[in-house]
Design a protein with these regions (language model features):
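Thiamine diphosphate
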Residues: 1-162
Length: 162
């Protein structure tokens, strides 16, 4: 397990997941990237929409190397933690809205695979049904989970109240 908390760098997680998955494959002597089947070991990534925008190009490498990964995009429409710390209504904490469901095909994944392995969830029920589909698939899987702009807990929630 790796975490961005070590470096406090939001753009760290997608490239780190690529590196960890490639390393895991090398240790386990997985299929070579030219194979028609994805690499067997897999990684699971939870990444915010703002962090993804800073390192999205690595999705192309994940697809190119046929990394078996499940990517959960936590879409809170911007810098949620920064809103709590530096001002909930500051415009610089907002980001452009992307069509994440098109990301796999945009970065070169097979169109049929992209359609079968791209999901969105706005409710717990939708997320539960998506999880069943994700478990039955392989290759790159992308799940966009929509959250509220100020969906915080604990001390961060207290900061928003002040």
């Amino acid at each position: 397990m790796i975490t961005a908390a070590t470096w406090l760098s939001i753009e760290y997680m997608l490239p780190a997941t690529l590196g960890a998955a490639l390393g895991q494959c090398e240790v386990r002597e997985c299929e070579v990237p030219q194979s028609s089947r994805p690499i067997t070991p897999y990684a699971i990534l939870f990444i915010g929409d703002e962090s993804l925008q800073m390192s999205i190009q690595e999705l192309g490498n994940i697809i190119r190397h046929r990394i078996n990964v499940i990517i959960f995009i936590i879409n809170s429409h911007g810098y949620t933690i920064e809103r709590a710390i530096h001002g909930r209504h500051q415009e610089y904490n907002d980001i452009a809205s992307w069509r994440h469901v098109q990301a796999l095909s945009f970065f070169g994944n097979d169109e049929d695979h992209a359609k079968r392995n791209t999901f969105a969830a706005t409710t717990w029920e939708e997320l539960e049904s998506v999880l069943d589909l994700v478990r039955k698939s392989d290759g790159v899987r992308l799940v966009e989970v929509f959250m509220g702009r100020e969906d915080n807990q604990g001390a961060l929630l207290d900061l928003l109240k002040n």
